[in-house]
């Protein structure tokens, strides 16, 4: 799994914390430091919005303005049973 993020993004930190807490391995890609990665996000999503997760080739934004981190969707997409 890849996580497209920036260092200054609070929502990116929350998404990575969720993954860490559930033992999900990922590769972080900083779109501020990698112009090709930034262009990749733009190509797939239509705008430079982070965080973006790529799970088995599928792009997913785990955050929505006004809703915060989409925990239910994360549990489902990652196959994590909810307590």
Report residues per predicted region.
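Nucleotide phosphate-binding site architecture
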Residues: 10, 32, 61
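Non-catalytic interaction surface on structured domains
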Residues: 18, 42-43, 67-69
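Thiol-based oxidoreductase modules, predominantly thioredoxin-like and allied folds used
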Residues: 23-38, 47
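Positions that flank functional sites
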Residues: 34, 41, 57
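Rhodanese-like catalytic fold shared by cysteine-dependent sulfurtransferases
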Residues: 43-44, 80
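Structural micro-motif
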Residues: 45-55
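Non-catalytic, surface beta->alpha helical segment in thiol-disulfide oxidoreductase systems
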Residues: 55-83
């Amino acid at each position: 799994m890849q996580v497209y993020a920036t260092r200054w993004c609070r929502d990116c930190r929350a998404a990575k914390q969720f993954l860490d807490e559930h033992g999900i391995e990922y590769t972080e890609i900083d779109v501020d430091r990698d112009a090709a990665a930034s262009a990749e996000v733009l190509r797939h999503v239509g705008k430079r919005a982070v965080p973006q997760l790529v799970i088995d080739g599928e792009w997913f934004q785990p955050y929505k303005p006004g809703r915060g981190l989409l925990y239910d969707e994360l549990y489902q997409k990652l196959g994590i049973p909810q307590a």
